[in-house]
Amino acid sequence: MIVQTDGREISDFLTTYVNTSIFMRWKIVVLFLLFAILLLMFFYHFQLDCEKRFPRAYQMIIISLISFLFVLELPNQVKFFKLLFSSDTIQEIEGMTFQNYDKGAATPMHRLLLSLSVTSHTDNLLRNIHQATLEAEIDSCSHESPHIVLVIGETYNKHHSQLYGYPLQTTPYQAQRNAAGELFVFKDVVTPWNITSNVFTSAFSLWHYGDIESIGHYPLFPILFKRAGYQVRFFSNQYIQDGLLRGGTNLSGGFFLGDEVLSDSLFNYRNESPSYFDMGLIRQLREYVDSVGNVPYTLDIIHLIGQHFSYKKRYPRSAEYFHITDYKSRHLPNEQSELIAAYDNATRYNDLVIDSIITHYEHDDAIIVYVADHGEEVFDDLPVRGRLFQEPSKRQANQEFEVPLWIWCSPAYRSSHRKIVDEIKSSVNQPFMIDDLSQLLLYLAGIHSKWTNHSCCPISKEYNSSRPRLIYGKVDYDKLK
């Protein structure tokens, strides 16, 4: 196991991963056969020992007990080996684990087999994405939007946003801009995963759930922007280019951001170090933009640490606004009220960060798309905090899979791109899932290629609003009750 994260992530949430390409699936079979042989040898010697020590009746009791336990565990083992051998992608493996297909992984050997299977899938996926991305080309580009900004929030429960009806003032700057008619707030947006790394893979890939071919056959969208002459800059407070040494990568999604060749192909620039608070990341953005001067076409991707646990570490003490007394009417234990207050403070500080991003682009011909990767349980519909990695109920999906998405246009952009502004304005009630986020960005840029699909862009007249929105790759969000 290799820990692929920085010191901050280690202190907040310890995660271990496997990252090696030397094992393939046939070696999993060999290991399993060796394990089976050892198991048979053990039972053979156990049987001989029983025959010497115990009379026939006791032997029958032991055999019956072992047989009963075998039958009891058999369904879990069948599901486990289905997980091991019938799943084709890393996303499918994770989706099946949330349906308890890994329940049979009760021993270190089982977990080793599963880890090797995940490693094999990941290696194959990375190779395929490499090829699809590096070979991708465009047909044309009108540069409809010269400066596009994608802001990706982290662990944002939209139901704790004043913008979406939360009673406390967690987003005063956004609320003020919305009241002034500056924001186009989308009402019905969901994410396919409640795991950041998987969301990144889904959002960056031009593949979406429902495509016949697997995700490895599709390129990552930033390459099309680079082919079109955009300078693509990636500012992240989580995924840093130096991978193991400086930032975080992840087998199941963010791994492509840790690949040097792929990263260089996708981005003209990436920041080299994270900032403790998100406002520090915005300072890095400003310093870089000032250093390079005017660039005709840019795509800036800004990835915040947002409201990632631990909530109290996401804002400076001077930004503390809410206290446990603000939640007295909910009759919660003080410990829970304190956590909610910290989360709401992180959300309010995030609002300040977002407003500083808007201010930075206010005088450019720019459009900003804000979306969060996933939500979070904060003692609302369910008496829990964090995320539940299981097949979701409707209540869980409301908190963890519904995400905020809004679009802001600068005064110059509103003046020169009235058609797009009108299309955005008329689309805010469209149901949308962010695995098609790349299609929205391609539409805004006017990029045409074999990968462009206007039926997946929520502001296009060709948009297919009836497409199933599958979370975990299996569960239809709109059919949850």
Annotate each predicted stretch with a short phrase.
Residues 1-96:
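Transmembrane and membrane-interface helices of multi-pass
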Residues 2, 11, 158-161, 174, ...:
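Proline/Glycine/Serine-rich low-complexity intrinsically disordered segments
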Residues 380, 420-428, 432-434, 445-480:
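Polar, surface-exposed loop/tail segments
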Residues 71-328, 402, 433-434, 438-464:
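Active-site-proximal alpha/beta segments of enzymes that process anionic O-linked groups
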Residues 202, 264-268, 329-339, 417-423:
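Short glycine/proline-rich turn/loop motifs
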Residues 212-219, 337-348, 392-403, 414-441, ...:
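A short beta-strand-to-alpha-helix junction
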Residues 134, 283-289, 325-370, 407, ...:
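A long, amphipathic alpha-helix that forms part
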Residues 165-169, 366-417, 454, 468:
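Histidine-centered active-site microenvironments of extracellular/periplasmic hydrolases
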